[in-house]
From Swiss-Prot:
Gene source species: Syntrophotalea carbinolica (strain DSM 2380 / NBRC 103641 / GraBd1)
Entry keyword Lipid biosynthesis: yes
NCBIfam families: lpxC
SUPFAM superfamilies listed in its UniProt record: Ribosomal protein S5 domain 2-like
Name of the encoding gene: lpxC
Required cofactor(s): Zn(2+)
GO terms, molecular function: metal ion binding; UDP-3-O-acyl-N-acetylglucosamine deacetylase activity
Protein name: UDP-3-O-acyl-N-acetylglucosamine deacetylase
Enzyme Commission code(s) on record: 3.5.1.108
Length: 309
């Protein structure tokens, strides 16, 4: 898709917050070109608008949290990943709680609702952040790098000392169709002892086997098991798509990550923005000339077969 897009019409989404356990409602409203994604939250007395960009990230310990003027919205990464993959550039999001609903722990419900609502193409051309030089970030065992690519690609490796996870590897060229089929259904995951600790400390109050893969000493506790043998690494890719969307533009680059999470993802986004000599903003017409439209949403599915050099 050459041009920016927003939703066809308002979309209301309700669900439980993972950490608060509260019922939360969001109203996603169409926005003008170049608006970006903006969350509007309230504490009952005032309304604060928080653009979903890296500069507004205030916490990455358990999820990606954006905030401004003392108010914040947590766990935005699954929704942001779905918006990016479905080609939504501009949106107002009214939210009546401190976190995005967890839904089933994946991005699949968001993708289904967005595709049912549909996109409205706008008159402004879309811009891409095209990586021109490699950038690498290392934090202990965690590593993230990004190198030039004509598409948005993610290669991810994780390593856990548990037989249910162990070593997992997945590489993907991210577009609407691959995201919908291979990444969006992957749920957040955690170990039983971690969940118990969080709940004892007033967190993960909305967490359950209905919205997370929970792993005990003997294996996965969910009655239906996992959706993919490598569901955990797929979910890490989902998180990365959401976290890298906070660059404010779709990426043309190949992300390679090892043991990465929200913290180092955010650090990498900040490092990219700080090294302006390593990237260039290009308009969609120029990106299309390089065969780069496979990232751009529902109308771009037909481009997914374009060969990459």
């Amino acid at each position: 898709m050459i041009y920016q897009s927003t939703l066809n019409k308002p979309l209301t989404i309700s669900g439980i917050g993972l950490h608060t356990g509260r019922q939360i409602t969001m109203i996603l409203r169409p926005a003008e070109p170049d608006n970006g994604i903006i969350f509007h939250c309230t504490d009952g007395e005032r309304r604060v608008s928080i653009p979903a960009v890296s500069a507004n990230v205030v916490d990455t310990r358990l999820a990606t949290v954006i905030g401004k003027d003392g108010l914040s919205v947590s766990t935005i990464e699954h929704l942001m990943a779905a918006l990016s993959a479905c080609g939504i550039d501009n949106l107002h999001i009214d939210i009546d709680g401190p976190e995005v609903p967890v839904m089933d722990g994946s991005a699949a419900p968001f993708v289904a609702l967005l595709q049912e609502t549909g996109n409205r193409v706008q008159e402004k051309r879309r811009k891409y952040l095209a990586i021109r030089k490699p950038i690498t970030l290392v934090d202990g065992e965690k590593r993230v790098s990004i190198i030039p690519s004509r598409f948005f690609r993610i290669t991810f490796d994780i390593a856990f000392d548990h037989p249910c996870i162990g070593l997992q590897h997945r590489a993907i060229k991210v577009n609407t169709e691959t995201f919908r089929k291979e990444i969006a259904p992957a749920r957040t995951f955690g170990f039983l002892h971690e969940v118990e600790y969080l709940k004892a400390n007033g967190l993960a109050l909305g967490g359950s086997l209905d919205n997370a893969v929970v792993i005990g000493e003997e294996g996965v506790l969910n009655p239906d098991g996992v959706r993919f043998e490598d569901e955990c690494v797929r979910h890490k890719i989902l998180d990365a798509v959401g976290d890298f969307s906070l660059l404010g533009h779709r990426v043309l680059g190949h992300v390679k990550a090892y043991k990465a999470g929200h913290d180092i993802n955010h650090q990498m986004v900040e490092k990219i923005l700080a090294n302006a000599d390593c990237w260039q903003l290009v308009e969609s017409g120029e990106a299309a000339s390089h065969g780069s439209l496979s990232m751009t949403g529902c109308a771009a599915m037909a481009m997914a077969g374009v060969a990459e050099a």
